[in-house]
Amino acid sequence: MAIKVHGSPMSTATMRVAACLIEKELDFEFVPVDMASGEHKKHPYLSLNPFGQVPAFEDGDLKLFESRAITQYIAHVYADNGYQLILQDPKKMPSMSVWMEVEGQKFEPPATKLTWELGIKPIIGMTTDDAAVKESEAQLSKVLDIYETQLAESKYLGGDSFTLVDLHHIPNIYYLMSSKVKEVFDSRPRVSAWCADILARPAWVKGLEKLQK
């Protein structure tokens, strides 16, 4: 049975899963979820994701939700496909695990808030909360200071090869690099170079194209 991704083309979490699948050279069916009409909050969608969020993922009889859990499943189960997104060396895996936690716990909260305020709200006709932007930008700046130091030690955040750590960052960075917060990234040379590198990955570009068809 085909892999299916239920989600929204605008959703950073949906983008994350699509990019992972394409990095692994896996075919999948994208099933758009009409969030404007509240489809994600109703049955039958709630049978796929009981929290009423996107994406939801199906691989045969297996059903998953939460984008980072989905990408880890893909990277491990399909380890021999496409690009290797996990570090198999037990001595290197801990570093990757640490920075995956950093992305989810430190980077994601301010980055997601900024993506919502500066990337999504203008598209759907809502007013940006300038105070929220200022607060989140200050939080993000502190995180990126640490990233700048880490990227002096390795080419990517989890080590010297591109992994899920970096992939998980891409969707929010994609939105923010088209906003005034771009300067927060550009003012840190190593962070800026890292962003340019990961945003240029063919799998990311192909993933966007697939979701926006």
Swiss-Prot record:
Keyword Transcription regulation (UniProt): no
Catalytic activity: RX + glutathione = an S-substituted glutathione + a halide anion + H(+)
Domain GST N-terminal stretches: 1-82
Keyword terms, alphabetized: Transferase
Residues the record lists as binding glutathione: S11, T12, A13, H40, K41, Q53, V54, E66, S67
Gene Ontology process terms (BP): glutathione metabolic process; toxin catabolic process
Family, similarity comment: Belongs to the GST superfamily. Phi family.
Protein name as annotated: Glutathione S-transferase PARB
Organism: Nicotiana tabacum
